[in-house]
Amino acid sequence: MLDLEIVPEISLGCDAWEFVLGMHFSQAIAIIQSQVGIIKGVQVLYSDTTPLGVDIIINLPQDGVRLIFDPVSQRLKTIEVFNMKLVKLRYFGVYFNSPEVLPSIEQIEHSFGATHPGVYDAAKQLFALHFRGLSFYFPVDSKLHSGYAHGLSSLVFLNGASPVVSKMSLYAGSNVLENRVPSLPLSCYHRQMYLESATVLRTAFGHTKGLKLKLFTEGSGRALEPRRQCFTRELLFGDSCEDVATSLGAPNRIFFKSEDKMKIHSSSVNRQAQSKRSDIFFNYFTLGIDVLFDARTQTCKKFILHTNYPGHFNFNMYHRCEFQFLLQADHPSMSDSGHDLVTPTKQEHVNITAYTKWDAISSALATSERPVVLHRASSTNTANPFGSTFCYGYQDLIFEVMPNSHIASVTLYNTAPPRQPAHSWQQHKMQDIRLTVA
């Protein structure tokens, strides 16, 4: 049985770990993985069809705890204890729920003090007692006398027994129905760098140059207290490994690309140009970005931006990359009657973000009609339970699209000649790389 301390508006945890409101989904999963053998029977619930409209939930049925994450920010917004019998709970070190201490009305008021009168939900037959950042729910029979104007303690119970808490909710703010998602707490920074936004830099001729990143991390003020520190960095095609490491710090992982499963779609000349050295990936998981360096020139030739949607093979590996860029539309917008809404001479752009669906993009851009079907598996002869994705090429971009039309990732290629050596340019022509997928 878990023995946990609650801090209203802040956290639920113990000396070894804690679930903190505002923490990222992947951080909560990391805690659960560290407690293997202690926390069991974990369930992850999400919507395949509307991943942005339904909360992501981590359910711990054997411990009576439920973690509710905002589907857009993917940060923890509510902690629920839905079975009080499966967990011990303390407040300022004093138990208010355990096998020896029942969480009755009197016990809750004794532990947490006075608060506003409770609110009765006749439909659910629950009485809710709200504190700031904390709510308790008591099952109350509908035949109960309605003299509760002065709080739960004024209720007259027919059998003389005070009800006990059936559910507890921990959240930020004073209203559980309007609880906000906190920003990432400083205690969850762990000396990592995080992304606020990423702007794709493109030339007037439609070529990608690189990325402009707005970042934040843990800094220190005059009193040496931790605080949020913000700054901006630019990554450009042709940057060396040292340039990127200087701008972003050491990557979370370095991956040597030993094979390219899409190489067969390239020309025979490029397939024969095999290098004994491997291209190198810098994986920045907390930024949602991969940087690929050419094995020959040791310079950046590709960026991969991940959206971290549930139901994708790489879900929970990356934080969502909040990217944004504009593409000039190839097709004019159409009205419901089928007539053009803009004149052919007027330029129109498509704003693409991590939340733009492929249906909206493909209706405005002349993308490749037939996608490349991408199958992923963790090892040879193993199945991918999440299914395949579809890759569409457009200019120097590749969109990886999920079956629900959401973008799983965007790959940005370098279509300009590399800084060195010049003769390697023929290996990166767009007609070959537009079908290449990391």
Curated annotation (Swiss-Prot):
Primary site of residence: cytoplasm
InterPro entries listed in its UniProt record: PHAF1, PHAF1/BROMI
Keyword Cytoplasm included in the entry's annotation: yes
Family matches, as Pfam families: PHAF1 (PF03676)
Record's keyword annotation contains Metal-binding: no
Domain of life: Eukaryota
Keywords in alphabetical order: Cytoplasm
Annotated compartments: Cytoplasm; Preautophagosomal structure
GO terms under cellular component: phagophore assembly site; trans-Golgi network
GO biological process: Golgi to plasma membrane protein transport
Family label: Belongs to the PHAF1 family.
Function text: May play a regulatory role in autophagic activity.
Identification of the protein by name: PHAF1 protein CG7083
Record organism: Drosophila melanogaster
